[in-house]
A protein has these predicted regions:
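Short acidic, Pro/Gly- and aromatic-enriched capping/linker segments at domain boundaries
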Residues: 7-21
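Active-site mouth of glycoside hydrolases
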Residues: 17-24, 29-32, 37-194
């Protein structure tokens, strides 16, 4: 991934915008054809088949209540290691797709408790893997902070407390911007990211 491999790129390697069109490095119009990797880095209840336990926070709490925090932490590590793999990306590429949307929870780039970890989240490690797999298979990646600090919709999909606090909380807004700056700086030379 980007953490272990230096990506040598120039502006010509990136998809660019001309008017309303996306332009591929070869000069042709680029049309996004793809899918997303939902539920992997931002668990959602409906994707697990749950009817009432629907946000990442609630799912984690339910698991902790049912099997305890130690097994829950082990479960999340196994889940992240196996829910999406290189083979999945290879299959997606074989269908003719050219892009993957990667929804993620902001906590993957913080030291907040999330998916079994209490410090040193593994967001860059997880995204690095997807980027490497996508680069190897000719796919682009759209990074999607699906769960922003404070929540951006107030619905279960953003793991909020029922209100879009991101829109009112300066602390949440600052954290949102800080995380995106960190991600942008880390991946600034990676042309696979749209």
């Amino acid at each position: 991934g980007c953490a272990t491999t230096t990506v040598k790129s120039s502006p010509e390697d990136f998809i660019r915008i001309e008017g309303q069109d996306l332009i591929a490095p070869d000069g042709s119009k680029f049309f996004i054809k793809g899918t997303n990797l939902g539920n992997w880095l931002n668990p959602e209840g409906y994707m697990f088949g749950f009817s009432k336990t629907n946000s990442a926070r609630m799912i984690d709490q339910m698991f902790c209540e049912m099997v305890g925090p130690d097994f829950t932490a082990e479960f999340w590590e196994m889940f992240k290691d196996n829910y999406v793999t290189r083979a999945d990306i290879e299959f997606i590429a074989s269908t003719g797709a050219n892009t993957i949307r990667l929804p993620f929870h902001y906590k993957l780039f913080t030291d907040e408790d999330y998916m079994g970890r209490t410090v040193a989240q593994d967001g860059f490690e997880r995204v690095d893997s997807v980027i490497t797999w996508c680069r190897d298979n000719g796919l682009y990646v759209i990074l999607d902070m699906h769960d922003a600090p404070g929540g951006q919709t107030g619905d279960n999909i953003d793991d909020s407390y029922g209100y879009p606090w991101l829109l009112e909380s300066e602390k949440s807004q600052q954290l949102f911007c800080d995380i995106w700056r960190k991600i942008a700086d880390y991946y600034k030379d990676e042309p696979v990211i749209l």
